[in-house]
A protein has these predicted regions:
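Conserved catalytic or regulatory cores that recognize and/or transform ribose-phosphate-containing ligands
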Residues: 1-124
């Protein structure tokens, strides 16, 4: 599992700003989504997790739009996104999130594959 190294910055008041990362990926990988939040947090990232991983819950179209809007706001607020792409799988929603992050010039890191630009690219 690739975990990117965060770069914290010192603020004028002496406090530290930890970089923010949004986790993206299919809810079929619930265990991996939960595990990666812990790994990223321990590495020093402030993590926005996937908001809903309970596949048994029925979500109507209006709620899907709301949840998508919230997730896009997480991406805009973040310094980067982290894609849980177990066995190379990236579904349609996750692909859309990657494109959205790229539109906002956010670096994209992959659980399997490292960084989008190839830096620190390593496989577990």
């Amino acid at each position: 599992m690739f975990i990117p190294e965060p770069v914290a910055t010192m603020l004028p008041d002496g406090s530290v700003r930890h970089p923010i990362i949004t986790v993206c990926g299919s809810t079929r990988f619930k265990e991996e989504l939960i595990a990666v939040v812990g790994e990223l947090t321990h590495a020093g990232w402030l993590v926005f997790p996937v908001g809903v991983t309970d596949k048994s819950r029925v979500i109507d179209d209006a709620k899907k739009v709301l949840l998508n809007d919230i997730h896009q706001q997480k991406i805009r607020t973040s310094d980067a996104i982290y894609v849980v792409n177990k066995d190379g799988y990236i579904g349609e929603s996750t692909a859309n999130e990657i494109r959205y992050a790229q539109l906002w010039l956010r670096p994209v890191y992959y659980m399997e594959g490292g960084a989008e630009d190839g830096t620190n690219a390593e496989r577990s």
